Amino acid sequence: MSEELELESEFLPEEKSETIVPATVLTQSAGIERGKFRSLTLINWNGFFARTFDLDELVTTLSGGNGAGKSTTMAGFVTALIPDLTLLHFRNTTEAGASGGSRDKGLHGKLRPGVCYAVLDAVNSRQQRILAGVRLQQVAGRDKKVDIKTFSIQGLEISQNPTAVLTETVSQRQARVLSLTELKDRIEEQGAQFKQYHSVADYHAMMFELGMIPRRLRSSSDRSKFYKLIEASLYGGISSAITKSLRDYLLPENLGVRKAFQDMESALRENRMTLEAIKMTQSDRDLFKHLITETTNYVASDYMRNANERQGNIETALSFRKEWYAAKSEQDLSQHRLIDLSREAAELTENEKALEIDHQSASDHLNLVLNALRHQERIERYQEDVNELTEKLEEQKIVVENANEQLEESQLQFETLETEVDQIRGQLADYQQALDAQQTRALQYQQAIQALEKAKALCGLADLSVKNAEVYHEEFEAQVETLTDRVLQLEQKMSISEAAKTQFDKAYQLVCKIAGEIPRSAAWDSAKELLREYPTQKLQAQQTPQLRAKLHELEQRYQQQQSAVKILKDFNQRAGLSLETADELEDYHAEQEALIENLTAEFSEQVETRSTLRQKLEQLTALFEEKARSAPAWITAKSALERLTEQSGEQFEDNQDVMNFMQAQLEKEREFTMQRDQLEHKRQQLDEQISRLSQPDGSEDARLNVLAERFGGVLLSELYDDVAIEDAPYFSALYGPARHAIVVRDLNAVKEQLAHLDDCPDDLYLIEGDPAAFDDSVHSAQELAQGVVVQVSERELRYSKFPEIPLFGRAAREKYLTELEAERDKIVEQYAQRAFDVQKCQRLHQQFSQFVGLHLALAFQPDPEQQMREINQQRNEINRELTALSTDEQQLRIKLDNAKEQMQLLNKLIPQLNVIADESLSDKVEECREQLDIAEQDEIFIRQHGMTLSQLEPIANTLQSDPENYERLKDDLYQAIDMQKQAQQKAFALADVIHRQAHFSYEDTVKTETNDLNEKLRVRLEQVQAKREQQRDQVRQKQQQFAQYNQVYIQLQSSFETKNQMLKELMDEVGELGLTVDENSEQRARVRKDELHHQLSTSRQRRSFVEKQLTLIESEAENLTRRIRKAERDYKQQRELVVAAKVSWCVVLRLSRNSDVEKRLTRREFAYLSADELRSMSDKALGSLRTAVADNEYLRDALRISEDSRKPENKVRFFIAVYQHLRERIRQDIIKTDDPIDAIEQMEIELSRLTDELTGREQKLAISSESVANIMRKTIQREQNRIRMLNQGLQNISFGQVKSVRLVVNIRDTHAMLLDALSGNQEEYQDLFNDNRMTFSEAIAKLYQRLNPHIDMGQRTAQTIGEELLDYRNYLDLQVEVYRGADGWLQAESGALSTGEAIGTGMSILLMVVQSWEEESRRIRGKDIIPCRLLFLDEAARLDGKSISTLFELCERLDMQLLIAAPENISPEKGTTYKLVRKISGNQEHVHVVGLRGFGAKE
């Protein structure tokens, strides 16, 4: 993300030419200069778009008011220095006093959106310019996360400004921030090196190597310490986090001593484990030999047994196949003899099956005829009932229709009377509801008018009035009577026409059912045609069974004729002839008899030849068996010779070659023995030299340590233990023979003890001096090109050359130790090789001696297996000749069988020549089939329509005339009835008007008239109600009568449908039977059945006779068939066995070859043992193996799986598992061989040598408690001296009332007791260190618990506690004290000091930590690198001017840079000050910065 913002002003115009960092920094001085930070660059920070702060060599001050950006600038520096988000937390801008803080660790709010940079520019001691920084970017989301990526740039010129590198100028007042990818491209274009780091550890490793940070930060713990130091410096005061763990900051971890202890413990542990393994291997040697021997016998015997069985199975399968093929050949020859009788038997069987089918068909036909006759009787009976019911049903239908008409008329009259009663009741109600006469009269008048209007509308009379209403009423009454008479006439005519129409419709429906839909006019012609053909079709249907039987007989005879023709054709085709007459067939019969006699004689000659060859084969077999008996011993001798050839790499042609090689092997063994002894002596010398140089304090004689402790002094080598490897030759030559001297404080006090020394080196040097502040000014020395001249005394000079291999100082000793250890490892490897060569020669000579005694007489004899192969070739030739004879014999048999087969065909053809001669048989069959087709069609027609034709025949004459006027009469009747109803309605409306004539007149006496009118209406109502009740009774009677008639009709209809349904079912069943019966049908069916039964009995008698003859002839063929089947079954079973064994054998071979064990399993001598002997050998070995592997779960499971005889590959897997187990158990790192047997033999001697060697090494590596105590005391004393040196640099520091600062280091009482117990002679503690089951760490932990039983050790193990006790830092207590006013020395705590004093004291402690880190890392840093020193101080206003001057003086004295922040009232005289002012112009906010050089600075 790039942004374009307005560039900020850098410096004031008059100050642009001023350089903050002097140019002298970049010049190469005579000595090594300390690295310095040149500048800090902030890009796109809050208030700083592109700002570079040049840092002063001493103090850089950020001055400004609150919010000016001082803390932001320091935060940018800290972020670039420690870019670890898990540590960064700027508390002064987040939550004051909070321990956790917000999710924004004070960094997110200091950045602006987009790409941001914080870059440090430094120049190290090598005058290399390094730009190290971070790219920061806000991550979207409410968590306020920041993404950080670290990078570095090297190779830029000094003149290039970091701001110009990180931004791109867009215009005069605008610039764009480059992304990380764009920055990389730009740097590479300029020829510099850009590197991005994927972890903070890599970033800090680069900064350490280039001298930007004081120590290597390997882990997050180291980064946390560094950050806490920077944080304590930034916020000022005494940091409790540092003072509480001051040991971790000031005291370096003595990794060398600790690692030496761990290495010694590991070596001891490994030696003890190796010794136990050696003892176990020696005790298991006999078991291993027994295991490998029994495993080989167990697997190899089964392996060779399977190989022998596979070969035997193959040979057996080949013999079975040979026997099978021979039997099949015999079967092919014998089958020709059985063809005739087999064919005849087959034909008789087929004929019998056909007769059985015909007989069964005849029986079924007889049953069908009987069933059809019974159905026919029932059909006739049901047909009569149906006809009778049809007549009754038609009569009853007429009665029901008449009753229905009467009921409808009565209902119509009843409805008319009901309407009239309702009207009269309405009038009465209207009259009764009238309140006065006028209302009644008005109401009556309105109703009369409504009735008159209704009559006008209904009658269509516009001039209708009260006066002429009666005239019209009479006229309509006359019309109603006329229409009633017409309806009665039409009903009478309708009843007469309906009877004629019913018969016509019935006959027409029957014709349509048979002939399909036809016009009514063509119904009579179609009926005549059907009735005319009906008798002929009926007769043809009756003849169908006879025609079918006749056709069956003709077809059977025709099939016999075709079969005979086919046999004759096959015979001519096989024989290649065209015989047709009986004479020709008889002549050919005689020729075949002569041919059979000749073939029989030739067959006898071949039998004699085969017997001679078999005798010769038996002789060769006896010779083969003799060679096979002598082969195993020769194979064993040859295998032994081959093994010796492989091991020696020589080829032996005869016995003398073997003896010469044995003599040469003895000479070679003596030579190797001498070389081995020389290497052993040289290795012992190197071990002694390494042991002397491995002493932690540099003393080569352990007695010097005792003397130094006795005199209260320190070894000179211990004081110079940290000397650099470059200075080691100088100091080694400077002190010469006195390099192993003891430095004591008072020589006079020591002189008194010299006389009482018992055990001391021959030359003991003592030097007087302070061990805590010793220097090399003891002698007056002058360094020359190749050595050092030392003025020992006025009259004595000593010149010592620089040693080629200096041993003064730990670094020099470690370097030389590395070389000696490499040389010793090389000597050990050579010694092991020579020892192995000696053992190899001894073992090879022993094996040759054994070979000479057992196998030398047989090894060089001719190969018996080669002779056996030659014998096998001869046997195979004889077998081939026997196979050829067998083939010829089979061909003779085939010819003989063919001749016999032709004889059988001739015997069968001669009796059937008469049938073949009948040529008219096919025409008869076709003619009979056509007649049967016609009869079957008529039979189907009669079956479908016979009943319909019988019903049509009596009523067919009704079709001659069609009653077409029936429909017209029916329409006239309905029309007349409608007119009658309309006339009745009109007459009723006029009658209503007439009844209301009085309502049209007006009378004066209304009441009288009303009463009279009411009386008339009541009278009329009573009359009409009486008529209605009478009419209701009449309707009820009509309904009952109609219901009775209808019930009878329904019963008749139901009975008719039932009878008719049963009739249809019977007719369908008869139709399904597919035949038409008559009086003679039963007799014909019985005669046909009896005839077929007679024919079937005759055929069965003939077939029984033929089968008896066939059984006699087939007895030999059946025996041969059983023989073939047995041979085939045996062959297939054997072949399956071979195939299955092949699959398993392939798995075994592949497994053995891939595992390189095939050669070990192929024991050729086992091939001559029987299967029982091999199985017995395998079973014996299995019993022994079960006992041998009983304690090994893996081998026990593998052995159990291998016992499955169906899977021989499991035995090979077991063999491989045993060899793999042996390879794992033996010491493959000592003896290199692929053969476990050879390795076991080699290990026996090699392990006995290692036993002595490891026992001696364990004695050398044994750690004594006294030596541990001495090492601890020396290390503690050295660190105490170093702390005293640090205190010298803090003596003149003063802040306020604090006049001095110092570090106090003491040994803890509990650990002092432990040191005394380790170095003392208490016998009660030695049991812990003499226990081989405990390591030294565990022993020292147990001792610590004994001495301090009151201390709770928690859940920690003894090993963990012991490892902590081997760290000298846990023995010390380290505190900071200050000398303050009248109080004297006090412990440095923030509560006892003022703010300024606490800040100054804390800064002093941090300086000590930094200086200690630099010294600690001096050995692992480049010799030409002195790291940068820079600390921070925020809110420096809390210090007074004197304290600030003290800080400046401290920075100048310690060559340290300081970055402080202060309000505007702080203006130090030295260093560089930046005035920061935050300004807002428009919508943009930026910090205006002005850089000022201190006015007290020296040019």
Swiss-Prot record:
GO molecular function: ATP binding; DNA binding
Chain segments annotated as coiled-coil in the UniProt record: 335-501, 540-622, 666-695, 865-940, 1007-1053, 1100-1143, 1238-1294
Location of this chain's protein in the cell: Cytoplasm, Nucleoid
Chief location bin: cytoplasm
GO CC annotation: cytoplasm; nucleoid
SUPFAM superfamilies xrefs: P-loop containing nucleoside triphosphate hydrolases (SSF52540)
UniProt xrefs under Pfam families: MukB, MukB_hinge, SbcC_Walker_B
Keywords: ATP-binding, Cell cycle, Cell division, Chromosome partition, Coiled coil, Cytoplasm, DNA condensation, DNA-binding, Nucleotide-binding
Stretch list, region Flexible hinge: 696-813
InterPro entries: MukB, MukB/SMC, MukB_hinge, MukB_hinge_sf, MukB_N_dom, P-loop_NTPase
Entry binding sites for ATP: G64, G65, N66, G67, A68, G69, K70, S71
Gene Ontology biological-process annotations: cell division; chromosome condensation; chromosome segregation; DNA replication
Family that this chain belongs to: Belongs to the SMC family. MukB subfamily.
PANTHER family (UniProt xref): CHROMOSOME PARTITION PROTEIN MUKB, DUF4476 DOMAIN-CONTAINING PROTEIN
Assembly and interaction partners: Homodimerization via its hinge domain. Binds to DNA via its C-terminal region. Interacts, and probably forms a ternary complex, with MukE and MukF via its C-terminal region. The complex formation is stimulated by calcium or magnesium. Interacts with tubulin-related protein FtsZ.
HAMAP family to which the protein is assigned, alphabetical: MukB
Domain notes: The hinge domain, which separates the large intramolecular coiled coil regions, allows the homodimerization, forming a V-shaped homodimer.
Function in brief: Plays a central role in chromosome condensation, segregation and cell cycle progression. Functions as a homodimer, which is essential for chromosome partition. Involved in negative DNA supercoiling in vivo, and by this means organize and compact chromosomes. May achieve or facilitate chromosome segregation by condensation DNA from both sides of a centrally located replisome during cell division.
Protein name per UniProt: Chromosome partition protein MukB
Organism: Mannheimia succiniciproducens (strain KCTC 0769BP / MBEL55E)
